């Protein structure tokens, strides 16, 4: 019987010698699951936010800090995991991160007050983001920029099941158990990913390139070099601001849909899943576009649609046109644009990073979740009487994404 190390060596040799255009199915599923840590950890418990507020007697704006603390943890944790993945390989940091994610999820299930839950959500994010960082680095290890954009689109298809299925699952869990059972389900998800990484995922860090880093100073130097690269920063911020608008929607939609428009908690997943289908469909159509267009040209057009959708959403919220059905239209358009923006911005940002792909992936994630934290907090702080705070933040994120791309990258192709 083959040992795990033998399987790893076999896949390493296979991946190095074959001109792969897509990863093996098991590899694709594991990477998709790792990249789904954020949507799973967020979307699964969204239907439970009102129940959490009721049990702890907390204001909805306070409960939303369980989201903000998660975003902060995702931003800070990635700058730790990235250099570790470049120095020690892709798999060891994954083992540690996934293990602590399981423990933090169990802790969330037994939290006795809202403050403890907020802190444990932070721990959950710091540990779980290892999967997100390293999954992106693994793709960069094996593919060029153009092919990477196609692979990221495939991964969005896999990870896109999370925002479709998770709210449904969370809502149905609430029909039979308390919100605490949702976090036990997350612990099982983390454990399954840990086993999958151990059993099937090969080590992919390039063996012919010296490991980067030698401590905090070396890591900071790498981050400084990356931030001085205008194109890297422009692509990272274009993707980051666009996804921050998506997180503003994730933060605000439970209150808007359930509390303001009276959608039952167990039906919330239908609306959330509808928008997620748009994101998945656009990410897959992106693969077809990339057969005869550059990732940069697709990204340019997607940025314009992001601005259009955000401003239309703001107008609908200000004027109060048509209630929830009309509000859903620009939200859907915005998420469709994310499906074009996210894979192409990521692929171009990581295109020439080589052995420091882990650090570059981490910095992208930190920038993305840093602005997502601000966007999420703004939705909570701007008030809860209408959809306007959510709409204003989404529109602002779309404009900032467009501005970052135009100012730092410009109009050329990658």
Language model regions located:
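Helix-to-loop junctions at the C-terminal end of transmembrane segments
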Residues: 78-88, 282-297
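A late C-terminal transmembrane helix in Major Facilitator Superfamily
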Residues: 347-385, 393-394
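Paired small-residue
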Residues: 100-107, 115-123, 325-331
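Conserved MFS/SLC helix-loop-helix module at the cytosolic interface between two early adjacent transmembrane helices
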Residues: 76-115
């Amino acid at each position: 019987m083959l040992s795990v190390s033998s399987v790893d060596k076999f896949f390493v040799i296979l991946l190095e010698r074959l001109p792969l255009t897509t990863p093996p199915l098991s590899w694709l599923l594991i990477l998709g699951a790792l990249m789904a840590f954020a949507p799973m950890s967020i979307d699964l418990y969204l239907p439970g936010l009102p129940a959490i507020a009721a049990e702890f007697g907390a204001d909805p704006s306070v409960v939303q800090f369980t989201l903000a603390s998660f975003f902060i943890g995702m931003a800070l944790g990635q700058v730790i995991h990235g250099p570790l993945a470049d120095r020690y390989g892709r798999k060891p940091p994954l083992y540690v991160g996934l293990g602590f994610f399981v423990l933090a999820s169990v802790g969330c299930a037994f939290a006795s007050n809202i403050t403890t839950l907020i802190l444990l959500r932070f721990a959950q994010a710091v540990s779980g983001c290892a999967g997100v960082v390293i999954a992106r680095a693994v793709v960069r290890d094996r593919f060029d920029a153009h092919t990477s954009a196609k692979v990221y689109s495939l991964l969005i298809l896999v990870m896109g099941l999370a925002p479709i299925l998770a709210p449904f699952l969370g809502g149905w869990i609430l029909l039979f158990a308390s919100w605490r059972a949702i976090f036990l389900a997350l612990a099982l998800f983390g454990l399954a990913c840990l086993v999958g990484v151990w059993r099937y995922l090969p080590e992919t860090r390039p063996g012919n390139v010296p490991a980067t880093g030698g401590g905090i100073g070396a890591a900071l130097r790498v981050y400084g070099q990356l931030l001085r690269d205008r194109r890297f920063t422009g692509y990272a911020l274009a993707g980051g601001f666009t996804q921050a608008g998506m997180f503003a929607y994730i933060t605000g939609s439970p209150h808007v849909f359930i509390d303001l428009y009276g959608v039952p908690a167990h039906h919330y997943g239908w609306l959330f899943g509808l928008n997620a289908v748009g994101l998945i469909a656009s990410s897959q159509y992106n693969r077809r576009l990339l057969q005869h267009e550059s990732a940069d040209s697709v990204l340019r057009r997607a940025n314009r649609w992001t601005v259009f959708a955000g401003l239309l959403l703001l107008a609908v919220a200000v004027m109060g046109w048509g209630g929830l059905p009309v509000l859903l239209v620009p939200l859907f358009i915005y998420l469709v644009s994310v499906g074009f923006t996210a894979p192409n911005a990521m692929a171009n940002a990581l295109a020439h990073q080589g052995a420091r792909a882990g650090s570059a992936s981490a910095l992208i994630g930190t920038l993305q979740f840093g602005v997502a934290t601000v966007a999420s907090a703004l939705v909570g702080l701007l008030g809860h009487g209408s959809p306007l705070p959510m709409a204003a933040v989404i529109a602002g994120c779309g404009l900032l994404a467009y501005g970052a791309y135009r100012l730092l990258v410009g109009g050329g192709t990658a």
